[in-house]
Amino acid sequence: WSEAERLTFLETELHSARPFTTAKAPLGAEATTVMACLRTIERHTAHYGTNCIGSFIVSMTRSLSDLLAVYVLAREAGLTVMTDEGMVCKIPVVPLLETIDDLEAGPAILQAFLSHPFTQRSLRYQQQQTQAGYLKQQVMVGYSDSNKDGGILASQWNLY
C-alpha cells in the first residue's frame, strides 16, 4: 500500500472504537505474536500501571503511518481508553529515526505525528496520568543504522 492508502485505512480505524479483529480470529504468525505480546502488556499494566512498561519504541520509523499503526494495535489489545475528548493510547508511542533518509524526514514525520488529533489527545491524557506540568513526547535518534547506512561522517553530520 502507498503511504496515502495506509493513512486512509488507519484514520478510519482510529475513528472507531470497535475491534478490528476478535480475540480468537486466526491471524498470521507474526500478527499473533505481536498481539499476544500487547495483550500481555495490557494485563501487566492493568495490574501494575503504565509506568511499568515505559514507551512503545517504533524502530525504523519511516512515516506517520508507522506510528499510527501502533495506536490501532494498542486499541486491539485494550491499551487505549475512551475519554471525553475521544480515544487515547495509555502508553507513549516513540519514533526511532535510524537511517539518514529517516533522519532527514524526521521533522516532517514529527510535525505530522504531533499535530495528529489522536497523538494530541494521548499526550494530554499521559500528562494527566503522570501529573506532569507539561506535555512530553520522546523521540529517539539512532546512530548505528545511520552509520551503516551512510558511513561515519554522513551519520554524524545528519545526527548533528
Language-model segments: residues:
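Active-site capping/gating regions of soluble enzymes
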Residues: 41-46, 68-85, 94, 98-160
